């Protein structure tokens, strides 16, 4: 059914072909509905009038009321002049300044007339001024209708073509007045609206663009944010419910001799309570008859690999094979080494398949895999190639999930008669509200404690001028037999940046530490060169590894005890935490040194303080989300389960995310097949919102 909101934006009074082109190209606004959902990013209270004597240069946008006393002109060049209007409210004087548009100014603003002036006060030559302010003639205003003024994001192109926030505001107000009452269809159930004390969808649209008070803004935002989050959650849970019905999983009902022998003889230490809890959750999944789709979160060193191995042993005890995919060859080798060390002489065959495995060795692995003679295959993307066939793949473990595309994981499905159980591991802590939105279709397990005896990493902030003590500390650590990472933000010198670069830094460090062996690793090296340099460090052949952030994920060198991050202000919290996680893997005390200049923004200082204050990855992830925002909700578009969030903010709307989740769960619990007529309003609206039918969520 065609709605008034489907009308082309060109047919809105005040738009026309030229503005239509700008709106569509710059803001992706094509219809009335698109404009209605282009929400303001902030509001200013226009009911408050300040006296000129009250102004200060640290004020945000304010307004004053008064009369123009006189105009003055100051030449800036042969063809340009600055126009200044001296403006008074009877008690003080402020200057209104324009650097262009003199003809328009003299035509529209008159000496002696009363105006309301709106802008940001600044000080110039000892006097307050408003540069290019908004001015309204008091005689033209309905003062009783002045309320909250919305502000809309615009692009540089729009500003150059005269379409700033005020122009968008005029269009939205025209739109709101043109839409007949009752023309906007409700998208939530009346019972839900009443129970949650929400305003109607129509009221919310009107008030979000044309509020009379702060209460109008808040009630409109709550309604529209909740609606957005509710449909994201409803879609996620609908997919998950459909997946549980459609895709049967292998039932791993027994714990057999391999698992029991490993647990009794080979387990290197007692499991933490968190590991035990996660194993129970995984066991419940594997014997449920449904395919497991579980995200396993755990900070660096929390014991995720051991949990993954025990999970794979359960599959082997039940007559199945297992695989583990890692994003790089060196990580695959580390997993292979770790798993073999755990298993010792147990009758479990573990092999590795990467792009480097070629010739007869590769043929042998592929043959034995298809025959069922290999129990666990560790590898990289090579595992998902068409030539790789398992006899019966029961579980796939994917390490560091963000390095694999969804389509790549989908190829795992072709490796077995039924879809294998999926366990996705990540050492990147994901805040609860974000996980609920991006990975909401996965069950989430968290290992939130480290094995006993592990010493917390000491994080210290140092300034650029403290490098002598820094280098002395590094020298002492290396002499005691430890290894050190030194991370640079850049590979080579940049004309536009005074940041330290790796190439120059490596040469200087070789001069500072002539008695030690250094490796260097960066993203422009050939993969084989990078792997070789990394392997030297892993094997202890070099003591100092000079690198960019390519060492951010997964590398395990227990002997490395110092992480130095230069120009640490250039890195986000999550990245700093991941880099820090390269150390602290052995029994010795480890250190992370964040080196910066003295001039730091308040946000950078917050990041540094948080890093020095805590090693808790989940606290850091929550803080990072609040400081940085969720960006584009990494993965939501390719996952096919979430929609663009136009007003909700995952970082700041955590309570609404949880509320939306709870309400969506109630609907799914009552109508898992999405067929009850009492919910047809919801299912029809969800169908309109969905932009893909690919069930990526079933693959995680």
Residue ranges and their predicted role:
Residues 515, 534-544, 551-558, 563-566, ...:
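Accessory helical-bundle/CTD segments and flexible terminal tails appended to RecA-like ATPase motors
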